[in-house]
Regions:
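Functional transmembrane core segments of multi-pass inner-membrane proteins
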Residues: 6, 97-206, 247-250
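Hydrophobic alpha-helical transmembrane segments and immediately flanking/interface helices
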Residues: 73-80, 94-103, 214-226
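N-terminal transmembrane signal-anchor/hairpin module of polytopic inner-membrane proteins
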Residues: 1-91, 246
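Transmembrane alpha-helical segments of multi-pass membrane transport proteins and ion-pumping complexes
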Residues: 11, 15-19, 85, 155-163, ...
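Core segments of transmembrane alpha-helices
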Residues: 76-83, 124-131, 181, 226-231
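C-terminal ends of transmembrane helices
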Residues: 18-23, 59-67, 107-119, 160-172, ...
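Hydrophobic alpha-helical transmembrane segments
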Residues: 1-12, 88, 133-140, 233-250
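Interfacial loop-to-transmembrane junctions
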Residues: 176-177, 210-236
């Protein structure tokens, strides 16, 4: 029953993430879901706040201009619902369940915005870093010292990577938002999990970049958003971090 409840919560959270992903990169105050057509910008009523509701209303098309909805809307809502529904199977402590659900929602938001806009926004990472440090006071398995050390380690390591990439590949190889994301991940995960998460994210990004280059889907000078891989690694470490750490140290 708890899984069903969290799945429904995840569906609603996915709808909220879509709103934030649409509005925050444009520096707009988050508002009700609206048509993706900038010349229309029709605001949906309560029944259309979720992709499912819009699909039931005229096949999902905007009633004002006929614009098809973003495919991302349904994928984010469905994916967040499924992921949230699985959380009670993976986490048995109520406070950890609630806080990790928030962490994962924020990381999903970062993935969406980075994929679509090549941005990792300070308005997302900086407040969440403070919250993550505060949550470390009440979460089992981590404490404030570990969270602070994790944030510092993430910040310093990725700052070093940023400068090396800048000298080697030129400006823009790695964005400053990636540095702040690494700091946020450290505050969420603590040490030593942040080290594993960063290595995992860098490895994942390198593998996928190599595949894209090999398939000639991108060129060598193309910008590839890196934050998405770091955020995916953070989600993996939130859910299975201790098991992965124990396996690596065994």
């Amino acid at each position: 029953m708890l899984n069903v409840l969290f799945g429904l919560i995840g569906l609603l959270v996915g709808g909220l993430l879509n709103v934030l992903a649409d509005d925050l990169p444009r520096r707009e105050q988050p508002s009700a879901p609206h048509c993706p057509n900038p010349e229309c910008d029709h605001v949906y009523g309560p029944a259309g706040w979720l992709a499912l509701g819009r699909r039931l209303q005229g096949g999902g098309r905007c009633p004002a201009c006929g614009q098809m909805p973003r495919r991302r809307w349904a994928w984010v809502e469905g994916g967040t619902a499924v992921l949230f529904a699985c959380l009670p199977w993976l986490i048995d402590t109520p406070i950890t369940l609630a806080v990790y659900a928030l962490f994962i929602a924020v990381l999903i938001l970062i993935i969406i915005i980075d994929l679509e806009n090549r941005l990792i926004l300070d308005v997302v990472t900086l407040p969440m870093t403070v919250l993550a440090l505060l949550f470390s006071l009440v979460l089992p398995g981590i404490n404030l010292i570990s969270a602070l050390l994790g944030a510092v380690v993430g910040l310093v390591l990725f700052l070093m990577i940023y400068w090396v990439a800048k000298v080697t590949f030129g400006p823009g190889a790695i964005g400053q938002g990636d540095i702040k994301l690494a700091m946020l991940m450290g505050a969420m995960l603590g040490v030593p999990h942040i080290l594993i998460a960063l290595m995992m994210g860098i490895f994942l990004g390198g593998i996928i970049s190599a595949v894209l280059l090999g398939a000639r889907l991108v060129t060598r000078d193309a910008y590839l958003p890196y934050g998405q891989y770091l955020a995916i690694a953070a989600i993996v470490m939130l859910l299975w971090g201790q098991a992965i750490t124990d396996w690596l140290l065994a």
